[in-house]
């Protein structure tokens, strides 16, 4: 399993997976940097897709991400309430 950076090439994978954990983050976010080692450890067991909100602002807005870091579980593209 791994951390997967969302790009234009794999964006549809995010929406089409049955279940996926998604982290919304930004490189300038201090809390995101502090969470990174934890996610790296967790990603040994599950895939986590990472969305840089600066690169995918519309996607962040469509999932109503208001603060970062934000962790969501998507089931068939539908988001749960944020985990953090």
Language model: regions and residue ranges:
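Typically the conserved alpha-helix immediately C-terminal to a functionally engaged Cys/Sec
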Residues: 31-45
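Non-catalytic, surface beta->alpha helical segment in thiol-disulfide oxidoreductase systems
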Residues: 67, 72-84
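Hydrophobic beta-strand anchors of alpha/beta hydrolase catalytic cores
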Residues: 21-22, 48, 71
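Structural microenvironment flanking redox-active thiols in thiol-disulfide oxidoreductases
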Residues: 53-61
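Conserved beta-strand segments of alpha/beta enzyme cores
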Residues: 2, 47-49
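The canonical Cys-X-X-Cys-His
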Residues: 29-32, 71
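Short active-site neighborhood of thiol/selenol oxidoreductases, capturing the structured segment around
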Residues: 15-27
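N-terminal leader/targeting and pre-domain segments
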Residues: 1-18
């Amino acid at each position: 399993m791994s951390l997967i950076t969302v790009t234009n090439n794999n964006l549809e994978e995010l929406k089409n997976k049955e279940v996926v954990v998604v982290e919304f983050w930004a490189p300038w976010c201090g809390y995101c940097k502090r969470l990174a080692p934890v996610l790296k450890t967790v990603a040994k067991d599950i895939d986590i897709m990472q969305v840089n909100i600066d690169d995918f602002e519309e996607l962040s807005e469509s999932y109503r991400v208001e603060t970062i870091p934000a962790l969501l579980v998507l089931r068939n593209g539908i988001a749960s309430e944020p985990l953090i």
